[in-house]
Curated annotation (Swiss-Prot):
InterPro entries: Znf_C2H2_type
Protein name, entry field: Transcriptional activator protein rdp1
Role of this protein: Acts as a DNA damage-response activator of rhp51. Binds to part of the DNA damage-responsive element (DRE), (5'-NG[GT]T[GA]-3').
ZnF start-end (C2H2-type): 139-162
Gene coding for it: rdp1
Keywords in alphabetical order: Activator, DNA-binding, Metal-binding, Nucleus, Transcription, Transcription regulation, Zinc, Zinc-finger
GO cellular component, one term: chromatin
């Protein structure tokens, strides 16, 4: 048979195709062996060679030995050529078999298998159960059964919602206020109640009814002890830590009345409403006095006593005051002249005519109870500006001409053309400025007093009046 015969060429082509098929199979098997070898070598490098493989024939050998034996145990072709990755041409169709088992990826990474005990990232299941996701709440409130993680949280909760009493400090005055039967702080104004002491204190510092009360004479009907008080009062611990003040002295009888639940009468809604109305009236009466530039502070730094003492002195010296209002003032007309407006008659001077209102000493035995009993109770602040019955004007409704123990309104100038009879609020609640017109018998805004006299009564504004008006504004702004 010649080389160029058709049978020889077909035989050569068939052998060549069979060799190519066998070589493709060998290349595929070699690639699989190389990938397995690289995987084992990489796992050994990552684990530092510490993982051991169990030899099925017995004994332990390292992964490097396994890889070497796996590489050396590759079958050879019929022509004696080893099946290594380096041999480029291998002509054999013998299948490739690995003699040693290869560890799975889960076993190399240390994951849990079916035969090994349960582990989680190197931690046993028993240890993992000792570490819960959320901490246990061990502090329980005995009032509302709420749970708290820390002791500080429970303490803040009790101080905010279950504290028996709170202390409101306003200037030199110190009020000890207790919760009512519903567990809330009720103000004397009767408008709202609060559960949190800080909210109640914010309201109390701006409430005229609360500010008009004497810290040492708080009515027991308003601030009485609830029947189920098992917490230690807050005032006992705080009074030991602070410096005593003269205004903090409480009579023993009053303190016992507030601390002993058996001595407190039952709750009476009508009595509580009457006391609340009396407190509102006290706030209305206290705003009627004029606060002079310099008031002797020889009392207990209480605006209540200072206002009432000033009213008593003004009534005692009624006959010496050059501008004191006569009892029959509403029945007589007053001549409007410019004589009283001389510069020497300026009350804002150091030696003015009204300096006699300030004595060297004021009586200190003035109680707010007298003014509450003698003064009419006004339901609202605006009702004091209305006309009073029996032919009296609005000044009488404001308290001028009442008994000497009441807080009165001291007139600055009796017969001014603008009839400016103003008041400065002692408690500085709203910077309220009020002017009184004698012709209209009504109260108007102080800023509109001059325009009111010019437009409604057609009176000319003299220079003296402008001077007095400007001085009064300076006095109000000081």
């Amino acid at each position: 048979m010649s080389e160029h015969s058709p049978e020889a060429s077909s035989t050569y082509a068939q052998v060549t195709s069979n060799d190519e098929l066998s070589s493709n199979k060998i290349y595929m098997n070699a690639d699989q062996n190389n990938s397995r070898k690289k995987e084992m070598d990489g796992s050994l490098q990552n684990n530092g060679g510490r993982l051991q493989n169990v030899n099925p024939l017995g004994g332990n050998e390292s992964m490097s030995a396994v890889a070497t034996s796996a590489a050396s145990s590759l079958p050879t072709a019929e022509n004696g050529v080893s099946l290594n990755a380096a041999s480029p041409t291998i002509h054999s169709n013998t299948p490739t078999v690995v003699s040693h088992p290869v560890m799975s990826g889960s076993e190399l990474k240390g994951e849990e298998s079916h035969n090994s005990p349960g582990t989680l990232n190197g931690t046993s299941v028993a240890n993992a159960s000792k570490q819960p996701n959320m901490p246990n709440a061990t502090f329980r409130c005995d009032k509302c059964d709420m749970m708290f993680v820390k002791q500080s949280g429970l303490t803040n909760h009790k101080r905010t919602y279950h504290q028996v009493e709170t202390v409101v400090i306003i200037g030199h005055r110190r009020y000890v206020w207790r919760r009512n039967e519903n567990g809330r702080f009720q103000c004397v104004c009767g408008r709202q109640n609060w559960r949190r002491p800080v909210n109640f204190a914010s309201h109390a510092k701006q409430c005229p009814s609360f500010l008009a009360m004497d810290p040492n004479n708080i009515p027991p009907e308003i601030n009485k002890v609830s029947p189920h008080d098992d917490l230690r009062p807050l005032s006992d611990s705080r009074r030991r830590a602070r410096r005593p003040h003269p205004s903090d002295t409480i009579p023993p009888g009053a303190s016992m009345a507030r601390s002993d639940p058996s001595q407190v009468p039952e709750s009476n809604p009508s009595a509580a409403a009457a006391v609340a109305a009396a407190a509102v009236a006290a706030a209305a009466n206290l705003t009627n006095g004029v606060n002079p530039p310099e008031v002797p502070r020889n009392l207990n730094s209480s605006l209540v006593d200072a206002a009432e003492s000033l009213a008593n002195v003004s009534q005692q010296q009624h006959h010496r005051h050059p501008f004191a209002r006569q009892p029959d003032y509403s029945a007589h007309s007053i001549p409007r002249t410019a004589a009283p407006y001389a510069p020497s008659m300026n009350m804002f001077a150091q030696n003015g005519p009204n300096t006699s209102l300030l004595p060297t000493a004021m009586p200190s035995d003035v109680s707010i109870s007298s003014s509450l009993q003698q003064q009419p109770i006004h339901p609202s602040y605006d009702s004091r500006f209305s006309k009073a019955p029996q032919g009296t004007d609005a000044l009488a409704a404001l308290g001028y001409g009442t008994p000497s123990s009441a807080a009165t309104l001291c007139p600055l100038y009796r017969d001014t053309p603008a009839a400016i009879v103003s008041e400065k609020l002692h408690l500085r609640l709203a910077n309220l400025r009020i002017a009184y017109c004698e012709d209209c018998r009504e109260f108007i805004s102080l800023n509109a007093a001059l325009d009111h006299r010019r437009s409604h009564h057609q009176q000319n504004i003299t220079g003296d009046l402008v001077h007095v008006y400007s001085d009064f504004l300076d006095f109000q702004n000081c």
